[in-house]
Amino acid sequence: MKKTISILLALVLCLGLMACGGSKTETPAAPAAPAAEAPAAEAPAAEAPAAEAPAVKAGFIFLHDENSTYDLNFINAAKEACEKLGVEYLLKTGIPEGQECYDAAAELVDEGCNFIFADSFGHEPFLLQAAKEFPEVQFCHATGTQAHTAGVANYHNAFASIYEGRFLGGVAAGLKLNQMIEEGTITADQAKVGYIGAFPYAEVKSGYTSFFLGVRYICPTATMEVTFTNSWYDPTLEKEGATKLISRGCVLISEHADSMGAPTECEANNIPFVFYNGSAADACPNTFIVASRINWAPYMEYAMGCVAKGEAIDVDWTGTIATESVLMTEINEQAAAPGTAEKLAEIKAMLENGSLKVFDTATFTVNGQTLTEYLADVDDMGDFQPETQVIADGEFQESIFRSAPYFDIDIDGITNIDA
């Protein structure tokens, strides 16, 4: 009888040890502390905190790979956030905005991911489909518009007030234009800026309008021409867009597209350039001024932290320049106008404390008129019907009623040369 009891006790102990070992394989362990700092006798394996925390395994879906500056910004943030939190992760790159996105999400679920993030606007319907099919998994989507109306508890949208960064980039551009005017390189009425947009979506319009308002804040005589590539990433079309704008007399260029096509063309033609998503100083040392980007690491850390703690993730999350979700690269002093760093610091402080509003309706007109009211299509039901009043207190309230931009207005001073 005693022998039988001893055998049973041994089996129970073995099973207990196996259970502890299993929980450690599901949750990547933090770097082990030196033996002298954590003696085994003082911290038994069965009492390790890692065994008590829910395991998070993250899966990420990217439209392109590291060659796209847009996707590289997300990839770097994903790695940073996961490594900071000690989260195991899988990356899927080159996933088109189609059924392939759903397939990639389903594969990540099969591989044990309970947090899945996709980075491109067109991924949304397919990621939402996956969220409905796998309710035990949390799905987060950058730049999307449907979470706040879809009513799917495990589906979430996120964005950041990148228009603040675009405005700062515009300020840097305006300073450069003023320098060119003062030096006699151009006259005040030749202060024409070019902008290469991917698509004529609200996200892109919000970006180039905020950039232009930053330019005008410093250089009141500036005008801007916009051309579209109808692709998020096409080095050839982006280069051709830059060539077209330069041939039309644009003396400074910016973009909302994802390759080095335009920056390299600007460098070849000695045209100053404000970039997006990362620095181009190494490739374009003579013309790159500065760039803005969304820092996605804070959101990813927040969302994965919610999964780990079993807490709800915000349906619509918006980061700001004050929360370091919007960042500027280092200024390239070789190309920037003198005093750019000091001016950007001054304007950044004003944006953070709210004394300066990017979309202050007193700073722009539409067909010669100041806007006092405007209905925007915030509740994206697929019908493109505006329903939400977005002007209040003399400001177009961007990214307040949902995280993704909905500024889709054509303001005076900007010309779409493709129209």
Predicted regions and their residues:
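C-terminal motif of bacterial Sec signal peptides marking the signal peptidase cleavage site
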Residues: G16-A19
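Positively charged n-region of N-terminal signal peptides that target proteins for export
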Residues: M1-L9
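A residue-level marker of the well-folded mature domains of exported/periplasmic proteins
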Residues: K24-A30, P34-A419
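Short, low-complexity patches enriched in S/T/P/G
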Residues: M1, S23-K24
